């Protein structure tokens, strides 16, 4: 090495700035702490050993972020308000510390009284919470008693359920207050009050019931509120219960490539059905899928439309009995059904939780546009409260809280009316660190009302709503990508779509609703009585049968080869299954009707000699 080269190297080394020892020490201290927190196990959280056994039985590897943060606070008796993503484990975050505290108390005091009241907005969520408690308490079932008040039973039955003072009561606010007011439920010694999906509890019109309950609960009760969004409703709840809880605004770190991939497709109202037909008939989406529509009629229109093409699906809406709804979700989670068509009738109750600055920006844009008055009215419109539906279960809810497992895709056949409802809909997929896809159909303003048989008022403001959704997702560093179908390949299927839509008339939809409701009521009674004694028979009860109220055309169930796109052929014919034309001809004729040996030798068409008659 030359002297000049060595001199340059020495100068370069001297010019490198020295590390700040203080900053280095801080970084070294922070990184191990973060790593240690991420490696925290359920054992480190200080839970009861029996709960740890149940956790191990369910094969939970380690606690999620919301569980790591909320459980220690809850065990210390602090009030908690936790905001975490859908599918992040919020239920376990309050159930585990609750069970642990009950077991700790019962070790020294065996007095029976209601310790905890869990308030939920919907019957479906109540059933899910009840099952979660049952699973986590599997090794201490004798020490934990639970009562679920959301089943449709008489007040006498509810009073009987509460007569033994169960440790935990799960209910909607209205039912809870009715029982407290009638003295069937005593909450004088209540120690825990939990609100799951806290923002939705208020949006469903339970404000008066919550006010009454807040005046009845003891002063020292511990309050826990869980939600996937932080909106004004949550602030209202804090005021109702006069609490200042520890706020946990949490977001799990996503691994690279994980999460939800969001797409939007602009199309006409009739083209929604065309694209849905192509997607499911050509199997462009693999795995289980939830399709959200705006009302019950749309549920049956889409189901009857799918029936024309032999596409099996089942329905979820507020008209169906609770037992049937719960069973549909359970069977869907067990991979019995692949497609659920869900009526999200209450998504309009949630006001948009966008920031005031964004609302002002929307108002400014609205003033500049030709539609200034309408858009400004939309921006200033107050949040809607629960609307009383003419029929159906007012405590029904499918887009919030319900734990659909391993859902590959969510399709917003009808776009929700708020960006908040959109967030919760797409939260049904990509749960617990999995991946998923969300596809939304948007009807442009110039295509609205162009096809009256399939038109619905819910599509009137699709473009405005999607603009808000895109802004909200951008704040979360999420992108809603355009999904452009190759309409040249899709158009050949249009005439088949038109044939199927013509068959799905209003009369057919009305008859389908009546028939489905009658069938599900019968199934619900069976689920309630017979299947309690014969649980193994439950798997034979299906909910995806054909309604057959629309005129069906057999040829629509099969796709002619000339209609198939070139790229779609291979994907469609991979799993063809048994085809008679390809059967091996060896051994043909060995089964079935027999024939006499030698008959071929006496073929009259070849020999012109008829066979002699035998006497």
Curated annotation (Swiss-Prot):
Residue spans of biased composition, Basic residues class: 583-594
Catalyzed chemical reaction(s): ATP + H2O = ADP + phosphate + H(+)
EC number: 3.6.4.13
Subcellular localization, as worded in the UniProt entry: Nucleus, Nucleolus
Short motif (Q motif): ranges: 40-68
Primary location: nucleus
Any one annotated GO CC term: cytosol
Domain Helicase ATP-binding: 71-248
Amino acid composition bias (Basic and acidic residues), ranges on this chain: 25-37
Ranges annotated as biased composition (Acidic residues): 351-363
Positions of the Helicase C-terminal domain: 259-491
List of residues binding ATP: 84-91
Motif DEAD box, residue range(s) on this chain: 196-199
Gene Ontology molecular functions: ATP binding; ATP hydrolysis activity; RNA binding; RNA helicase activity
Coiled-coil region: none
Region called Disordered, residue ranges: 1-37, 351-396, 583-615
GO BP annotations, alphabetical order: rRNA processing
Organism superkingdom: Eukaryota
Keywords: ATP-binding, Helicase, Hydrolase, Nucleotide-binding, Nucleus, Ribosome biogenesis, RNA-binding, rRNA processing
Function: ATP-binding RNA helicase involved in the biogenesis of 60S ribosomal subunits and is required for the normal formation of 25S and 5.8S rRNAs.
Protein family according to the UniProt entry: Belongs to the DEAD box helicase family. DDX56/DBP9 subfamily.
Free-text note on domains in this protein's UniProt record: The Q motif is unique to and characteristic of the DEAD box family of RNA helicases and controls ATP binding and hydrolysis.
The protein, known as: ATP-dependent RNA helicase DBP9
Name of the coding gene: DBP9
